Amino acid sequence: MKTSSPLETVRVELGARAYDILVGHGALSELGPRLSQMLKRPRAFVLTDETVARHHKDALEAAVKSAGIRLDWLSLPPGEKTKSFSQLEGVLDWLLAGGADRGDTLIAFGGGVIGDMGGLAASLMKRGMGFVQVPTTLLAQVDSSVGGKTAVNTPRGKNLIGAFYQPRLVIADTALLATLPARELKAGYAEIVKYGLINDAAFFDWLAVNGQKVLALEPEAARYAVARSCAAKAAIVAEDETETGVRQLLNLGHTFGHAFEAANEYRENLLHGEAVALGMALAFRYGAASGITPAADAARVTEVLGASGLPVSLEGFDPARFAADRLAALMQQDKKARAGRVPLILARGIGAAYVHPDADLASVERFLASELA
């Protein structure tokens, strides 16, 4: 990480496709100068949602005004249900109607849904147009905006249709997070904790002490947490861009979490980050029940996540939707599942995650039944 207070620059090293992540309070001011170097003509397309447009459209317009860049906007309904084939088709039609070509740039200005949709649309548009991420949620700033994963959901599961398509720039302005509800901040914080759990026990310890400062968006703490998270992900992506090896560790909590989201039919009473937090707590407890994870570490993970106001148990969820056999069947839909077995990201301790290649779904179902009892 390069430090230039109050901003930090994290480089994602991917050879000719390397790009910068600019992190900090006021980072949006860098968009105009950076964008003007990319564009062949002074206009760009902006995909956002109605909530982000209401709060931040003027800020984005102001950020590119001095560079003389005209922005064409499309605002979609907020929420996970927007990440669908029908909405994707609408985005592509908007780009085509606007005369977009491969030399143009699409800016995804929003959370993970907008970033995933925008990236997939950019990858498909005439086989690839320029793409810039300006994430406006904590979750998107530390996770989904970095690394090039794009996707839409289907009734059969989350993120099953997608592609790897890297942005050319990511602007993570922590000032944009001030309009987020506390619940959205907590959901993003779950992904920050994930990096400590994967391979950085010292960062987890720092978060256990400073997590409330991050959630309060104290500028130094927020910048440090976002930049350290982005640097952790950037290093993993540089080593394994297409998730054939170490990048799978970033799925800690996600195999459980995606099943919970699908069981809940992507309703807003369970946000993605909340599902990941619940999934991480269960992954550590499943590891403890299987003799893999020290019980004390599993208990500490549950405690730290719970102290942040994140869900750590299945208590209170609809027992019909979250029945153990139904959850196990949904986990079988995981992209990497094979013949009754599914790879799970487990941990030998905090900061020591690994790929457990063939967890038996029958044992997972028994564990879930015990959690629901």
UniProtKB/Swiss-Prot annotation:
Keywords of the record: Amino-acid biosynthesis, Aromatic amino acid biosynthesis, Cobalt, Cytoplasm, Lyase, Metal-binding, NAD, Nucleotide-binding, Zinc
MF terms in GO: 3-dehydroquinate synthase activity; metal ion binding; nucleotide binding
Residues that coordinate or bind Zn(2+): E191, H254, H272
GO CC annotation, single: cytoplasm
Obligatory cofactor(s): Co(2+); Zn(2+); NAD(+)
InterPro entries found in the cross-reference section: Dehydroquinate_synthase (IPR050071), DHQ_synth_AroB (IPR016037), DHQ_synth_fam (IPR030963), DHQS/DOIS_N (IPR030960), DHQS_C (IPR056179)
Top-tier EC class: lyase
Note accompanying the cofactor annotation: Binds 1 divalent metal cation per subunit. Can use either Co(2+) or Zn(2+).
Residues at which NAD(+) binds: G112, V113, I114, G115, D116, T136, T137, K149, K158
Gene3D superfamilies noted in UniProt: 3.40.50.1970, Dehydroquinate synthase-like - alpha domain (1.20.1090.10)
GO BP annotations listed: amino acid biosynthetic process; aromatic amino acid family biosynthetic process; chorismate biosynthetic process
EC number: 4.2.3.4
PANTHER family, per database record: 3-DEHYDROQUINATE SYNTHASE (PTHR43622), 3-DEHYDROQUINATE SYNTHASE, CHLOROPLASTIC (PTHR43622:SF7)
Homology family: Belongs to the sugar phosphate cyclases superfamily. Dehydroquinate synthase family.
Protein name: 3-dehydroquinate synthase
Source species: Hyphomonas neptunium (strain ATCC 15444)
